[in-house]
Amino acid sequence: MSKVNLVRLLAILGTLLLYFALSPYIHAQVTIAQISDTHIGLARAPHAADNLRKVVQMVNERNPDVVVVTGDIGERPSAWEEAREILKGLKAKVYYIPGNHDVHSDGPAKYRSVFGDDYYKFRIKYVTVYALDSQLLGNWDQFGAHQEPPMSPTIRKEGDEMLDWLAKEAKERDRDDRGQVVVAMQHVPDERDGGFPNDPKPYWVVNGEYQKREEEVLKKLGVHDILAGHWHDGRVFEAGGFRWHMAPATSWSTFGGKLGFALHTITPDGTVKTEFVFLN
């Protein structure tokens, strides 16, 4: 082999080695589509099912790695089934968590009988996602309440068990999640965006003891970004030491925001960039 050909071969081999060394970073970008507050079967949202069908098509066009559905799926078990049938059209794997319209103060048993676990974790590439049931952290059955309604002993016990599980995960994180970007998702956020919502009722956020306990353990887990819904308003803000990525609803608007979904792009350094994709 001539020196010229040898140099060319070495250059090609060097390029290939560099490509394979960098390929985990080149191809590692994670995209998560977030659909929230679909409210199938709600009287005030007569176009909810049609809107969800449109969103499924729009999500598929963007080819995310996974799709998360962050609560308020439907108003009754039959509506859950309708929502799931529509969401079967998604090409990516779908992960669900409940909202306050799915799980009420009587507990998550019905939800679990249809969707399985209401809190868990999953991994996609280098990202670990903690999917949480915010309905175990408060009582959102009374929209008009000016003080936080009491939680039942059963829900308190369930909430304590979820937070204990997170605490155990935090202790084991160095062993199991080394090098992982860790994010969380839940329906009701813990914090307000300054004065928004400008309604002082406790309905809009996790309050009191459970807010403090959850935020403490999520920080120990290394969570900086939390995906949430509930407000029907797409926005990103910082509060409580976290960046909150709030998805718009697909069904109806509470505060005049546009309907649509969120698309989150996560890079290996932990940066989460959110794009809102709106229905026409």
Task: Give a label for each model feature.
Residues 41-43, 74-79, 101-107, 137-143, ...:
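Active-site environment of divalent metal-dependent phosphoester hydrolases
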Residues 37, 67, 72, 99, ...:
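Divalent metal-coordination and catalytic microenvironments
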Residues 29-42, 126-140, 183-185, 243-249, ...:
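Active-site-proximal beta-strand elements of phosphoester/diester hydrolases
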Residues 57-66, 146-244, 273, 279:
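His/acidic metal-ligating clusters that form di-metal
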Residues 1-13:
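Bacterial N-terminal signal peptides that target proteins for export
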Residues 29, 122, 233-280:
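Binuclear metal-dependent phosphoesterase catalytic core
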Residues 10-23:
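Bacterial N-terminal signal peptides
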Residues 24-82:
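N-terminal active-site segment of His-dependent metallophosphoesterases
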